[in-house]
Amino acid sequence: MATDGASCEPDASRAPEEAAGATAEAARKEFDVDTLSKSELRMLLSVMEGELEARDLVIEALRARRKEVFIQERYGRFNLNDPFLALQRDYEAGAGDKEKKPVCTNPLSILEAVMAHCRKMQERMSTQLAAAESRQKKLEMEKLQLQALEQEHKKLAARLEEERGKNKQVVLMLVKECKQLSGKVIEEAQKLEEVMAKLEEEKKKTNELEEELSAEKRRSTEMEAQMEKQLSEFDTEREQLRAKLNREEAHTTDLKEEIDKMKKMIEQLKRGSDSKPSLSLPRKTKDRRSVSISVGTEGPLTRSVACQTDLAVESTEHVKKSPLTVPVKPSPGSAKGSVGANAALVRPGIDRQASHGDLIGASLPTVPPASANRIEENGPSTGSPPDLTSSAAQSPAAAPHGLPPAHGSQSGSQSPCASAPPHSAPPHPGLNPRVQAARFRFQGNANDPDQNGNTTQSPPSRDVSPTSRDNLVAKQLARNTVTQALSRFTSPPVGAAPRPGASPTGDVGAHPPVGRTSLKTPGVARVDRGNPPPIPPKKPGLSQTPSPPHPQLKVIMDSSRASNAGAKVDNKTVASSPPSSLPQGNRVISEENLPKSSSPQLPPKPSIDLTVAPAGCAVSALATSQVGAWPAETPGLNQPACSGSSLVIPTTTAFRSSINPVSASSCRPGASDSLLVTASGWSPSLTPLLMSGGPAPLAGRPTLLQQAAAQGNVTLLSMLLNEEGLDINYSCEDGHSALYSAAKNGHTDCVRLLLNAEAQVNAADKNGFTPLCAAAAQGHFECVELLIAYDAHINHAADGGQTPLYLACKNGNKECIKLLLEAGTDRSVKTRDGWTPVHAAVDTGNVDSLKLLMYHGAPAHGNSLNEEEPESDASDLDEGEESSEGKSKPVVPADLINHADREGWTAAHIAASKGFKNCLEILCRHRGLEPERRDKCNRTVHDVATDDCKHLLENLNALKIPLRISVGEIQPGNYGSNDFECENTICALHIRKQTSWDDFSKAVSQALTNHFQAISSDGWWSLEDTAFNNTADSDIGLSTSSVRAIMLGSVPWSAGQSLAQSPWDFMRKTKAEQVTVLLSGPQEGCLSSVTYTSMIPLQMLQNYLRLVEQYHNVIFHGPEGSLQDYIVHQLALCLKHRQMAAGFSCEIVSAEVDAGFSKEQLVDLFISSACLIPVKQSPVKKKIIIILENLEKSSLSELLGDFLAPLEIRSTESPCTFQKGNGLSECYYFHENCFLMGTIAKACLQGPDLLVQQHFRWVQLRWDGEPMQGLLQRFLRRKLVNKFRGQMPSPCDPVCKTIAWALSVWRQLNSCLARLGTPEALLGPKYFLPCPVVPGHAQATVKWMSKLWNAVIAPRVQEAILSRASVKRQPGFGQTTTKKHPSQGQQAVVKAALSILLNKAVLHGCPLPRAELDQHTADFKGGSFPLSLVSNYNSCSKKKESGAWRKVNTSPRRKSGRFSSPTWNKPDLSNEGIKNKTISQLNCNKNASLSKQKSLENDLSLMLNLDQSLSLGSDDEADLVRELQSMCSSKSESDISKIADSRDDLRTFDSSGNNPAFSATANNPRMPVSQKEVSPLSSHQTTECSNNKSKTEPGVSRVKSFLPVPRSKVTQCSQNTKRSSSSSNTRQIEINNNSKEENWNLHKNEHIEKLNK
């Protein structure tokens, strides 16, 4: 019930609320809040609050009610007092219903479940508690451990602190020790340096000792050689004495035989027999005597055994007129005598040759030996020049009895006795005429002409005399008999068989004939190739020599054949050396061994005058063979020598003589005047000549043919070729044919003979080499040309694949290469190793050969096959363009250039690995070259190249871009800038593909730095050396910071800037042809471009600008041509832009001052330009720059006198009043914004102009001080660098010498003009800036100098000297102040001064040769004045000085302690002239004059009286000297009338003594002279010294040399001197105590005077 009631309560409570709400709504419709009163509002508020509280209460009641309803619904069924009972009752009441379930869960089960849960939770909590306890225990353990660790940490920290303290102490100790050790190290280093210095000294001493020891060793070896020489000479003398003994024995036996024969003759005469035998017997007996004594009759007095002799007249007449009949076999005595003589004389010669390899001394005094291998033709090898002179001296006495001395000692045929002692004299004067006849008969026929030099083109004439043919066999039998006897003992020892065609010594000489031959130079008788030899005279009477039996025959050897007629041995050729004349006019050939050059040049052929004995041929002609000689009765070349007969070539060539004995054709009596008889086909006597009886048979014909071809014996070869059945193609063991041997040795005539005889032209040896191969390899281009003409196979390859072209390239034979290429040979033939001719040419490094291979046959506008490689002179900008090979395309294909051998190496690999840069450069010019081609070891050309070649390869594809410096627009020419250049090329930049912008920027910066250093350095060293030699003093202040911008073509670029493309691609794409560097100029407020243009250091220009900005009034003055106008205008321009950059407006006003420029015009200029403003007007802000040019043309004091104070104090406090044109005057003043600059072309101020000096700031441009002193040198250096495209030529280059000469001319001119006391004639460097720089043409510079001299220098000097001579004269002599027309004396002075200046300052040091210089001297005005009027040149003949220019010292020279030097007291005059003068007081008494006499004879002594004025008298020469003296040293007047003419040499000058300026200093003459003194402005007393002995020329008065006196010659004199009487030798001078003398010393080197002695 309660529930029901409870549930009804809410409904009951809602009803009144709803009723109240309904009434409220009804009331609200009529209710208006705004109309309520305050109390009503309060009541309303309270009602509403109560309503809210009621609402809260209702809410709470509703909540409680709902809670009760829930509980009732949930638990209302049960009795709360006994819930279990109620449940049981309810259960039991419904027990019948089995399916009935409890209403809710049993509370007991719920409790059990709760208890179970609680137990689980308890267990879980217990486990967690146990775990927590264990964790707690662990934590406590860890805490304990942590505490222990902390304790240990504290202990360790304490230890660490202790250790740190200890370490600090150790470190301090170590620092102290280091300091001590460093000190010790320094000490040890010093000691080491000392020890090293001592070591260097010891090394020097050791080196000196080594040099001394080596010198001693050389001396000892020389002494040893001399001893050996003497021993050999003693052996020779011993053998000669033995020979003499043998000859005496033989002579005895001959005399016995003659006695017997004479007895028989007497018997025959008694019997009345026929007279013919009686006529022939005396001749025969004479000849027999001659034979028996024919070998070595000279003994120790002659050099040659088989020497040509001149017979006595009787003997020679017999020889000429009668035929000679000789028995076939000689008598035993004769043979024995000959054997003994030869045996005695052969051995010492050979021994001596073995001990002295250089037996080739000069036997002709007029022919100095060219080398140790020189071969003397006419006799001994070891002879000395005195032999000839001694022989010539004894010739008159020796001629009647023996041979002429020249023949005896110099022109004998080759003999074993060629090594005679040096003291050889003519043969024994007492020799029997029969001995001479015998010598002539069997030896003298060595005069027969040599056959080597003749061609077979024209058969010579032959003697058809029947007598000669009939008697040929008999004479030859006789001679061959003697030959057999002689040849036994003139041969080498048995078993020493020589190589065929060569001598044991490896040198085969060409032997000219013996007889009256004369030496001539090769050029005299040289004929063009192909000319036939001239036909010789047939008559003996044509001989022009005094010896009757020797008709002279002149044979001109063909100039086309090589003179090395022998076989080539050891790669040496025989060349002709310059011959000389013998006393009797005999001509021989001298030859020398020359090393084989890479491109052989065959020497010209000498001409030989051959004299032939008509009576027959000499024994020695066959017994002593040579190159081209024909050995008679000798075994074959390859057979060993035997006792009976042997080859004699080793004996003759062992002495390296080059006497040509006669070969076979001249062995006929009738063929004495025919050289190539058998060449014409007629040789009737060949068989008896070759096969005459003897102990050994002759060798086979083929061997003899090869020997003749190898030796170049044309005559023997022609005879052999005329034989029938001879195999001319026979080959020896090596496969060498006769044609091969002749071609290999360069015997063109033999080659032509063999080819005409149809020899096989392509016959190859066992290695496959043809004659063409041999000739090409040896460089015999004439043989090559001949073989090619006879269709030789030009592309024949030997067994190794070598073609003639390959062999010629391998040996560098340029002419042969050219001939083969012209013949169309194949360049691409490869050897077995894969090498081509290009490989061979590159392997030897022969540039000419490679050029021929590359370019020969190219279509040619630029084909220069035979031209030299263009010199890498100036720069590499145009290397490829300037070289002519670059203009023509190579003819070889790319495949041939890139062909690789078996190792994979191309020609470029070979050239690069061997460092042949020139060859590699030529190869690189071929566009098909593949430098990246790799060999079999995978190496490129760059990998195997040397450093130089690597650099070349790296630059192969590099772009060469010229780098130029531009200074922009140069101001108009009236500013003095006509000679300046806007752009200068400084170098070439190599831009490669891998070049980065950083590299490019560094290269530009480095090039600029090098260039600035190069042009500012003092010397002529190269650009690479400037970094080491440049000093701060010579630096002009330019660097990379001076660059305003850089233009790559037309694209601007700044240093360090990186573009998208690489520099290489950028340059190629934009087609930039140059890189231009723009320097900062006045437009940027900088002066860098002005510095570079004018070469004035930047620091000095900045100082000038600072002076202008600071002082506002600056005047620049210096000699004319000192660039004052240019400097002023550039400074004004820079100042203007600076002011404009600062925000001011600025204007430049320029005015040229002339003689008519007045002060009123200047006032108008100042006022119109707002520089002068009225006092009432406020100052203007505008900047005005006034430039007054050429102020020297007006008086400064008159022009600027009224402006001095206002200019110095620029304010209204110092006004100046000027009258206007309307007559009114007004006050003006100069404001602070006005700058005044002026220029004066004058070296110094004078007179009233000095009053202006203190009111201006002056900039003096001295010619001998910076910036003018080094300006010209720097400017010309820059000009030279620009001319040579950025490169600095070598100091020894002629261009550098020319530039140095032009520079010295300017300096010496100014130096001499300053000494002359004419500062108004001084020249600035501007006149010399246009000096032409023309490489290789110094004449252009000399011509330019002559024009400058005539147009500028000479007129200025003339005007200055005349102005000096026309200054006011003293009134007592009636002289006018000026002279419109100079007198003759003054004209002479001008001419003399011009001549002296020209010779001493201009022509001195000229790089032209003296001959060319003499031609140009006439172009100089005043150069023809005779210096003998001024100086005495007679001593030149004694001193040998007539052609030498005297040197001039232009540099300031300090005073020596031995000269007395007064101090000048004129400070205002310290700005001009030479800084130092040597002022000396001379004691001119007799002894002093004598001591100075020589120096006064040689030099121009300008010792002058400067207080006393000189006058011109009637004598022009005296006037000239005196006036020139006053000109050269004095600023004072040289009065003409002061000096009277005196006949004697005594000239006395009185000291004026009235000059107060020098009165104080005269008493102290040893006071030092200031370096800034100006001696030309001072006054001195003139001292003259001369010598009477030196006469110049007839008609000229005695005028002494007034050239500069060396200081070493000047005698210091005492101050107190007395007048001495004049003598014939000296002029005595009276000198006062107060007089001063000046010595003008122009010698730069005083040792010249010593040389003149």
UniProtKB/Swiss-Prot annotation:
PTM sites of type Asymmetric dimethylarginine: R488
InterPro entries named in the record: Ankyrin_rpt (IPR002110), Ankyrin_rpt-contain_sf (IPR036770), Cortactin-Actin_Reg (IPR050719), Cortactin-binding_p2_N (IPR019131)
Record's keyword annotation contains tRNA-binding: no
Alphabetized GO MF terms: protein phosphatase 2A binding
Region of interest: Disordered: 1-27, 203-222, 268-297, 314-339, 356-609, 860-892, 1441-1472, 1545-1653
Segments of skewed composition (Polar residues): 379-389, 444-470, 478-490, 573-584, 1549-1564, 1572-1589
Gene3D superfamilies in the cross-refs: Ankyrin repeat-containing domain
Superkingdom as given in the UniProt entry: Eukaryota
Phosphoserine PTM positions: S1514
UniProt entry keywords in alphabetical sequence: ANK repeat, Cell projection, Coiled coil, Cytoplasm, Methylation, Phosphoprotein, Repeat, Synapse
Main location: cytoplasm
Gene Ontology annotations for the cellular component aspect, listed alphabetically: actin cytoskeleton; cell cortex; dendritic spine; FAR/SIN/STRIPAK complex
ANK repeat positions: 700-730, 734-763, 767-796, 800-829, 833-862, 903-933
Pfam families: AAA_lid_NAV1, Ank_2, CortBP2
Subcellular location: Cytoplasm, Cell cortex; Cell projection, Dendritic spine
Cited function: Regulates the dendritic spine distribution of CTTN/cortactin in hippocampal neurons, and thus controls dendritic spinogenesis and dendritic spine maintenance. Associates with the striatin-interacting phosphatase and kinase (STRIPAK) core complex to regulate dendritic spine distribution of the STRIPAK complex in hippocampal neurons.
Assembly mode: Interacts with CTTN/cortactin SH3 domain. Interacts with STRN, STRN4/zinedin and MOB4/phocein; this interactions mediate the association with the STRIPAK core complex and may regulate dendritic spine distribution of the STRIPAK complex in hippocampal neurons. Activation of glutamate receptors weakens the interaction with STRN and STRN4.
Protein name stated in the entry: Cortactin-binding protein 2
